[in-house]
C-alpha cells in the first residue's frame, strides 16, 4: 500500500478565506483545534519539521488557512486551520473564524477527514463538540488527537482516552469519530496518526479500477 512520507512536507500557500484556497485536485486533511491545544506542535512533530507550522506566543493570532503538500504527492495536502476559542480574541474575530471554518468544512470537496486537536487535560470543549457535529452532519470522518499526553500519568491519560471514546459511542458517532493519545514532547502516537491520514488521503490508491470509472 502506498504511503505518504510526511517528513517531506513543504509549505504550499496561505489563504485568508476559502475563496483563496488552492484548486481542489487531489485530497486533503485538515487540522483544527483550540489555539492552545498544541495543533502546530502536532503538525511539526508529524512532519519532523519544527518550523513548518508556525507557533505563536499569542494564541489565536493566526487567521490564515495554511496548506502543505509533498514533493512526491503534490495533490495530497495537510491543512492547518486557524485556531479557535481563545478568550482574548475579540468576539467579532471569533465569529468570523466560526463562519470560515463552517464554510470550509461544508464546501471543500477535496476534504477527506478532520483532525480535531484537543489538550488531553481539557477534552471536548464546547467548540470542539461543535466541530465534531459539523463534520458528522456532513458524514466527514473525524480523528480526535488528545495532545500533551505526557502531562498526565499514563493511567490518567488512558482513562481520558477511554472516556472520550465512550462519549462518542454514547453519541452514536463512533463509526465516524476515532481518538488517540499524542505527545509531541515524547514523540508518542506518530505512527497511529500517520495510518489515519494515509487512509484518508490515499483511499483511491486501494481501488484503482474504481478510480478510473
UniProtKB/Swiss-Prot annotation:
CDD domains: YihA_EngB (cd01876). GO terms for molecular function: GTP binding; metal ion binding. The keyword Cell division applies. One of its GO terms (biological process) is division septum assembly. Its cofactor is Mg(2+). GTP binds at residues 33-40, 60-64, 80-83, 147-150, 179-184. It comes from the Bacteria. GO terms for cellular component: cytosol. Mg(2+) binds at residues 40, 62. PROSITE patterns: G_ENGB (PS51706). InterPro entries: G_ENGB_dom, GTP-bd, GTP-bd_ribosome_bio_YsxC, P-loop_NTPase. Keywords: Cell cycle, Cell division, GTP-binding, Magnesium, Metal-binding, Nucleotide-binding, Septation. Residues 25-203 form the EngB-type G domain. Pfam families: MMR_HSR1. The keyword GTP-binding applies. Belongs to the TRAFAC class TrmE-Era-EngA-EngB-Septin-like GTPase superfamily. EngB GTPase family. Necessary for normal cell division and for the maintenance of normal septation. This is Probable GTP-binding protein EngB. It comes from Saccharophagus degradans (strain 2-40 / ATCC 43961 / DSM 17024). The gene is engB.
Amino acid at each position: 500500500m502506498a504511503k505518504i512520507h510526511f517528513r517531506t512536507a513543504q509549505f504550499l500557500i496561505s489563504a485568508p478565506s476559502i475563496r483563496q484556497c488552492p484548486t481542489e485536485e487531489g485530497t486533503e486533511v485538515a487540522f483544527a483545534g483550540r489555539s492552545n491545544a498544541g495543533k502546530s506542535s502536532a503538525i511539526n512533530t508529524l512532519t519532523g519539521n519544527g518550523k513548518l507550522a508556525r507557533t505563536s506566543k499569542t494564541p489565536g493570532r493566526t487567521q490564515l488557512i495554511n496548506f502543505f503538500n509533498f514533493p512526491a504527492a503534490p495533490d495530497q495536502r495537510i491543512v492547518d486551520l486557524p485556531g479557535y476559542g481563545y478568550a482574548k480574541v475579540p468576539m467579532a474575530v471569533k465569529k468570523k473564524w466560526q463562519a470560515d471554518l463552517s464554510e470550509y468544512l461544508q464546501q471543500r470537496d477535496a476534504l477527506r477527514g478532520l483532525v480535531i486537536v484537543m489538550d488531553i487535560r481539557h477534552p471536548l470543549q464546547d467548540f470542539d463538540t461543535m466541530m465534531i457535529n459539523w463534520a458528522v452532519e456532513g458524514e466527514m470522518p473525524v480523528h480526535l488527537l488528545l495532545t500533551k499526553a505526557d502531562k498526565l500519568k499514563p493511567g490518567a491519560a488512558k482513562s481520558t482516552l477511554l472516556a472520550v471514546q465512550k462519549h462518542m459511542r454514547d453519541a452514536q458517532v463512533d463509526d465516524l469519530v476515532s481518538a488517540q493519545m499524542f505527545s509531541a514532547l515524547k514523540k508518542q502516537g506518530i505512527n497511529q496518526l500517520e495510518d489515519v491520514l494515509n487512509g484518508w488521503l490515499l483511499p483511491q490508491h486501494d481501488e484503482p479500477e474504481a478510480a478510473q470509472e
